[in-house]
């Protein structure tokens, strides 16, 4: 038994063979080396899956049940010890509060009125004042109710989403990402917004002082984590990345765990890079929520500044900017739950030319109900380098309570540093900084190839359209919180329907669908296959049975895999009885805009069809790209998390389509059912063709 009273330590295992028949249990104690290895692994992964347990069995020469029961006992012991420590702290705080309460009661007995110097109110007078306040509150409440009823009676009726859907045209055709009407036709005004913007509340002086102190503490903690590498950082025994040593961190931070459930865990990671952007410009992008989303379009789905507190606050050191931000992060697939944070973001220059941007969660006095994630002090250190370069060191340190369970195929990926970790932020920053540098070129670089893009302005217009296409595609992937058709989800396809009200998108009802699967090929192999124009007509419904040629290529990064391309679809004269017809428009005018990239963690291929007239506006450079309607579909390619690079291991592939529903009048329910059936068949057939062409039909 554990001498600390925490139950079995997990280091003694009992067998139940003949000894159990004789009324005794045989005890086998683990060796010190086995215990040391198990303790170290428990710090990194307290909930190992079957594969990890089998790996430990082979390494420590133990039975699977011994490993399983050891981790169960260890978790129970840790929970008991944490509860005991919490109880001791709470008991001490309770005694302190009782002492303070008694002291304040004694002080109240001798308090004097500051106005007249007389004794305090008696009990009867205080009761009389309270009664007057209650009457005043009741009067104000009645006045508010009467005004509210008057407003409701005279407010005009507004159409609901159901009412607007009742007037939707029938499914005479389904347009796969193309607006069949006027290119500049405004989107429908009906339908709910994508998310409810958190309304800011006025901050009192005490709130501002508290937020500034929290930010100052976060900056000081990040200084130590950035500058004392050997003291706080160790290599993970799972994926060889650097993680925070829990014992060393708790000795100096005194951090309080915000989640006590068995599904909660702490993620930590760090990464470093050098980018070709001036430090001041980089800081400005980090502090502007719109530029923050543009800089990390594949991670930051939504962001909003709640309060900007400025620099005139009683904060230790030189605080340049202090603000409260809300952000929603989402990656890879609808099978991966989004993460929401309400953070205090502080930018502070700690030395000449060196800044720290610190984020730390804080929920007090804000309308924020998502309590599944808590960000411990995280952020980046930015150092200005010569020749307009910047060195960026990044730390992510987050507590996560998996209330919404992640799909099993993404668990290995999220358990390492490849999910929401620092490496993903760094590789995205590298890619987007390269793209910004190339987009600022005034002339046509020799790396580009184009038959239709002839000016630098046209080149920038097409690149901006590609950026907006990627942003729209990633926003569409956030459908994990709501599944409109659970019967399709059981078949592996997630379907969602929305009334499109976004500017720059075709107006009407849009059906979004996605499906994710694991493929036993490397991400580079899958990316190369999907990029191959010779085989594209075998899986892409837009070019099925045709010939696809590339007529323009704009390189957006140091690798030629990162590019924006314009594809032309040439129809053939061969007849195919199995050919699926998605729309009746002539394919002589079919073009596709495609934006793709590949980095150290995976890649993305996003594309959307356009007719000749729309593409002419895009490449002319004379029209704002945000006015061009576009509805993208595409693929997200990621490693499966079992290796550290995209050059080995397996692939997790997400396929996502968007379909615009249009036509003549019909009942909305019939439109929805037909649309869902069509898009489900479309995505399922595409996946089957891809699996067949990759020779992995069973994956």
From Swiss-Prot:
Highest taxon of the lineage: Eukaryota
GO CC term (a single one): nucleus
SMART domains noted in UniProt: HOX, START
Location(s), subcellular: Nucleus
Residue spans of biased composition, Basic residues class: 22-31
Domain START: 204-438
MF-aspect GO terms: DNA binding; DNA-binding transcription factor activity; lipid binding
Residue ranges, compositional bias (Polar residues): 10-19
Segments forming a coiled coil: 89-149
Stored PANTHER family: HOMEOBOX-LEUCINE ZIPPER PROTEIN HDG8, HOMEOBOX-LEUCINE ZIPPER PROTEIN MERISTEM L1
Role noted for this protein: Probable transcription factor.
Family the UniProt entry places it in: Belongs to the HD-ZIP homeobox family. Class IV subfamily.
The name this protein goes by in its record: Homeobox-leucine zipper protein HDG8
Organism: Arabidopsis thaliana (Mouse-ear cress)
